UniProtKB/Swiss-Prot annotation:
It catalyses: 3,3',5-triiodo-L-thyronine(out) = 3,3',5-triiodo-L-thyronine(in); L-thyroxine(out) = L-thyroxine(in); 3,3',5'-triiodo-L-thyronine(out) = 3,3',5'-triiodo-L-thyronine(in); 3,3'-diiodo-L-thyronine(out) = 3,3'-diiodo-L-thyronine(in). Keywords: Acetylation, Cell membrane, Disease variant, Membrane, Transmembrane, Transmembrane helix, Transport. GO terms for molecular function: amino acid transmembrane transporter activity; identical protein binding; monocarboxylic acid transmembrane transporter activity; thyroid hormone transmembrane transporter activity. Residues 118-143, 193-200, 251-258, 344-356, 408-409, 469-477 are extracellular. It is a multi-pass membrane protein. This is Monocarboxylate transporter 8. Residues 2-96, 165-171, 222-229, 280-322, 378-386, 431-447, 499-539 are cytoplasmic.
C-alpha cells in the first residue's frame, strides 16, 4: 500500500494529499505521531478509530487547495468586465425612427431658426443703422459688432457646450440654451442703446444659440445609426428652407413694424425651440451616469481628471491638424463679412431695388444644396484629399467677395450670391469628415470643438473691420476686397495639408520598416514561424 501511494503521488500531483490521508490511518502506528507536523492541524482534531475509513473524507484537506484555485479563477475575469454599457456603439442599437422623427423635426426647427436669423443679420443691420444714424453718422463700425458678436459666440462657446452636453445631457443643455436665447432676443426689444444690445443680442442670444444648436446635432446619434445620413439630410434641407424664408419675413416685419417689435416676433421662434428641446429624450447615458472604474479620492484629483478629460490638448500634437485649423481660422476673418454688409451695400449702390432680401434667399438655397451634394462627393474622395474641396470652396468664396463691388447690375449680384451659398455649404459639411481623417474618431469631437473656438475670434473681428473700412473710404468697395483676401490665404494654407500628411505617412512607414529589420527574432527557440521570411540557405 505504501508503494502504491508513492507511485500515485508522482502521477496525480496535488491530489495525492487526499490519498495519503486516506491511507495513513489504516493499519499503521503513525496516527500517534500525526499531530507533530504543524502545517496540517485540521485533519486530526480528534484521532478517529482505525477500523472506520468512512468519516475520513470529512477532514480531507484536499478541498482547501481547490478553494484557493477557484478563488483565483474568480478574480481573473474582473479586470475585463463583460457588462454591456449603453454608452458604447457596440452595446446600443438606436431605434432608427419612431419618436426619432419628432426629434428630427425639433433639430430642423433649431438649425433653421437659429441660422435663419443669423444669416439674415444683414437686414437687421440695415434696420439698426436707420435707428442709429440719427445719433451718429459713422456708426457702421459700432453697429457691426452686434451681429458679429452673436455669430462668433456660437463658435466660441462650442468647447464649453460639449462639456455641458456630456455632463447634463442634450435635453437640459438645449432647453437652457433656448431659454437664454429667448431672453436675449426679447430683452433686445426693450432697449435702444447700442451698447446694451451688444450684451442682449450679441452675447446672450449668441451664447444661447450655441447651447441650443450643438445638442441638436448630438441627439440624432441617439435615434439613428444606419439612417443617420438621411436624418442629417432632412435637417439640412429643412434648415435651408428656414434660411430662405427668414429674409422675406424679417424684411416684411421691418417695413410694417419697428426693430423692437421685430425682435419680439423673432423671440417666439426661440420660445417654440425651448419647448421642442424637451423632446431630446436621451437614449445614451451621459458620463455622469457611468461609474468610474478608478477611484479618485481627493477633490483636487477629481478636478484634474475632469480637466484632462475635457481639455485634452493631444490633438494639437498633430502637425497637420494645427496647420488645418490655422488655415480655416485665417479664412474665417472674411467669411461673415458679406452676410452683414451686403444688404447695406445694395441699398447704397442699387437704391431702386426694393427686394434686396432676394440675395439672402439665394445664399440660403444654394447653401442647402451644397450641403446635400458635398456629402455624397466627399464620400467618394479617399483620405485627406477631401481638403481640396475646402480649398476650392475658399478660393471661390474669396473671389466672389471681391467681385461684389465689380457687379454693375443686380443680376450679377444674384449670380455671386448663388456661388457664395454653394461655397458655404461645401465648407461646413466636410469639416467633420476631415477632422476624423486627421485625428481619428476618438478625438474628432474635441478637434471640431477647438476648431470652432479658433474660428470665433476672426469671425467676430471681420465685420467690424469691414465697417471701419467703410467709414474710412466712404464706400464698401475696399471692405469687400478685404473680405476676399483671408479666404484665399486660408485656401493656400490648406493646400499643403494633404501633401504634408502624405510625406509624414511615408516617413513613418520607412521608420517602421527599419524597426522591423532591426527587431530581434520573436521566437526564442529560433524556429521558423508561419508567415516569417525565408532564412538564408545553409552553406
Amino acid at each position: 500500500m505504501a508503494l502504491q501511494s508513492q507511485a500515485s503521488e508522482e502521477a496525480k500531483g496535488p491530489w495525492q494529499e487526499a490519498d495519503q490521508e486516506q491511507q495513513e490511518p489504516v493499519g499503521s502506528p503513525e496516527p500517534e505521531s500525526e499531530p507533530e507536523p504543524e502545517p496540517e492541524p485540521e485533519p486530526v482534531p480528534v484521532p478517529p478509530p482505525e477500523p472506520q475509513p468512512e468519516p475520513q473524507p470529512l477532514p480531507d484537506p484536499a478541498p482547501l487547495p481547490e478553494l484557493e484555485f477557484e478563488s483565483e479563477r474568480v478574480h481573473e475575469p474582473e479586470p475585463t468586465p463583460t457588462v454591456e454599457t449603453r454608452g458604447t456603439a457596440r452595446g446600443f442599437q438606436p431605434p432608427e425612427g419612431g419618436f426619432g422623427w419628432v426629434v428630427v423635426f425639433a433639430a430642423t426647427w433649431c438649425n433653421g431658426s437659429i441660422f435663419g436669423i443669423h444669416n439674415s443679420v444683414g437686414i437687421l443691420y440695415s434696420m439698426l443703422l436707420e435707428e442709429e444714424k440719427e445719433k451718429n453718422r459713422q456708426v457702421e463700425f459700432q453697429a457691426a459688432w452686434v451681429g458679429a458678436l452673436a455669430m462668433g459666440m456660437i463658435f466660441f462657446c462650442s468647447p464649453i457646450v460639449s462639456i455641458f452636453t456630456d455632463r447634463l445631457g442634450c435635453r437640459i443643455t438645449a432647453t437652457a440654451g433656448a431659454a437664454v436665447a429667448f431672453i436675449g432676443l426679447h430683452t433686445s426689444s426693450f432697449t435702444s442703446s447700442l451698447s446694451l444690445r451688444y450684451f442682449t443680442y450679441g452675447i446672450l442670444f449668441g451664447c444661447g444659440c450655441s447651447f441650443a444648436f450643438q445638442p441638436s446635432l448630438v441627439i440624432l446619434g441617439h435615434y439613428f445609426q444606419r439612417r443617420l445620413g438621411l436624418a442629417n439630410g432632412v435637417v439640412s434641407a429643412g434648415s435651408s428652407i428656414f434660411s430662405m424664408s427668414f429674409p422675406f419675413l424679417i424684411r416684411m416685419l421691418g417695413d410694417k413694424i419697428k426693430l423692437a417689435q421685430t425682435f419680439q416676433v423673432l423671440s417666439t421662434f426661440m420660445f417654440v425651440l425651448m419647448l421642442l428641446s424637451l423632446t431630446y429624450r436621451p437614449l445614451l447615458p451621459s458620463s455622469q451616469d457611468t461609474p468610474s472604474k478608478r477611484g479618485v479620492r481627493t477633490l483636487h484629483q477629481r478636478f484634474l481628471a475632469q480637466l484632462r478629460k475635457y481639455f485634452n490638448m493631444r490633438v494639437f500634437r498633430q502637425r497637420t491638424y494645427r496647420i488645418w485649423a490655422f488655415g480655416i481660422a485665417a479664412a474665417a476673418l472674411g467669411y461673415f463679412v458679406p452676410y452683414v454688409h451686403l444688404m447695406k451695400y445694395v441699398e447704397e449702390e442699387f437704391s431702386e431695388i426694393k427686394e434686396t432680401w432676394v440675395l439672402l434667399v439665394c445664399i440660403g438655397a444654394t447653401s442647402g444644396l451644397g450641403r446635400l451634394v458635398s456629402g455624397h462627393i466627399s464620400d467618394s474622395i479617399p483620405g485627406l484629399k477631401k481638403i481640396y474641396l475646402q480649398v476650392l470652396s475658399f478660393l471661390l468664396l474669396g473671389l466672389m467677395s471681391m467681385m461684389i463691388p465689380l457687379c454693375r447690375d443686380f443680376g450679377g449680384l444674384i449670380v455671386v450670391c448663388l456661388f457664395l451659398g454653394l461655397c458655404d455649404g461645401f465648407f461646413i459639411t466636410i469639416m467633420a469628415p476631415i477632422a476624423f481623417e486627421l485625428v481619428g474618431p476618438m478625438q474628432a469631437s474635441q478637434a471640431i470643438g477647438y476648431l470652432l473656438g479658433m474660428m470665433a475670434l476672426p469671425m467676430i473681428a471681420g465685420p467690424p473691420i469691414a465697417g471701419l473700412l467703410r467709414n474710412c473710404f466712404g464706400d464698401y468697395h475696399v471692405a469687400f476686397y478685404f473680405a476676399g483676401v483671408p479666404p484665399i490665404i486660408g485656401a493656400v494654407i490648406l493646400f499643403f495639408v494633404p501633401l504634408m500628411h502624405q510625406r509624414m505617412f511615408k516617413k513613418e512607414q520607412r521608420d517602421s520598416s527599419k524597426d522591423k529589420m532591426l527587431a530581434p527574432d520573436p521566437d526564442p527557440n529560433g524556429e521558423l514561424l508561419p508567415g516569417s521570411p525565408n532564412p538564408e540557405e545553409p552553406i
